[in-house]
């Protein structure tokens, strides 16, 4: 049975990603910083007959991430956990958000996936197969870049750069690495006014996590179509 690891899997898009991958026959490791919330999510998914286990994972904690290297198999990795650190400030312009807030965003949104990939990619290389999906945002798209929310925008833009770096380094392997803009999704982060349900937001992510051999790598996708960086 293939194994999928999803960070931030206890709610929102992450929870739906776990559900959809489980429905496709994956044994899902649901990463959650909060064990109680993680176990609650696992219980709900197991109630649907899915093979899901809770994995305590704080993507801002290097020691927590280091334990991932002990895993025996990971076929699909979805770097989904993220924070919108700018929301701690009333004025979210780049001239007012402190550098410390930007660093907080990078710690979770960029360095978290970076460290996770350092642990998981060797596992994928040993087994000769892997799919990595970095959940990004349209707010990181340089072609459409606007102002405000610098911690979120900059950290997610750097995550896209990580996708390109890894895809290049792994181009002669069967490990595919892509970024995705899930769209504006109704989650705690996206808010209740968002246009997409979590099921819709997860669809392209799951598609990228299950690409066939020879599929695209090093791309930025939305609605299963490649978009400009």
Predicted features along the sequence, with ranges:
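Canonical Rossmann dinucleotide-binding motif of NAD(H)/NADP(H)-dependent dehydrogenases/reductases
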Residues: 1-29
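Conserved glycine-rich Rossmann-like NAD(P)H-binding loop of the short-chain dehydrogenase/reductase
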Residues: 24-40
């Amino acid at each position: 049975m293939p194994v999928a690891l999803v960070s931030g899997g206890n709610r929102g898009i992450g929870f739906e990603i776990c559900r959809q991958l489980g429905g496709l026959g994956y044994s899902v490791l649901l990463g959650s910083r909060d064990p109680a919330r993680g176990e609650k999510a696992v219980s709900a998914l197991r109630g649907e007959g899915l093979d899901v286990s809770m994995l305590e994972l704080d993507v801002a904690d290097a020691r927590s991430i280091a334990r991932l290297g002990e895993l025996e198999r990971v076929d699909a990795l979805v770097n989904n956990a993220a924070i919108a650190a700018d929301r701690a400030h009333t004025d979210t312009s780049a001239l007012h958000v402190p550098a410390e807030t930007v660093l907080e965003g990078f710690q979770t949104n960029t360095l978290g996936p970076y460290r996770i990939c350092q642990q998981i990619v060797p596992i994928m290389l040993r087994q000769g197969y892997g799919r990595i999906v970095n959940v990004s945002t349209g707010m990181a798209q340089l072609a459409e870049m606007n102002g405000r929310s610098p911690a979120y925008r900059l950290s997610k833009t750097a995550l896209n750069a990580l996708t390109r770096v890894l895809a290049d380094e792994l181009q002669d392997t069967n490990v595919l690495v892509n970024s995705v803009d899930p769209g504006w999704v109704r989650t705690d982060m996206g808010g209740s006014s968002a246009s997409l349900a979590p099921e819709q937001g997860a669809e392209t992510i799951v598609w990228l996590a299950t690409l066939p051999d020879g599929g695209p790598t090093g791309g930025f996708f939305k609605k299963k179509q490649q978009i400009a960086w």
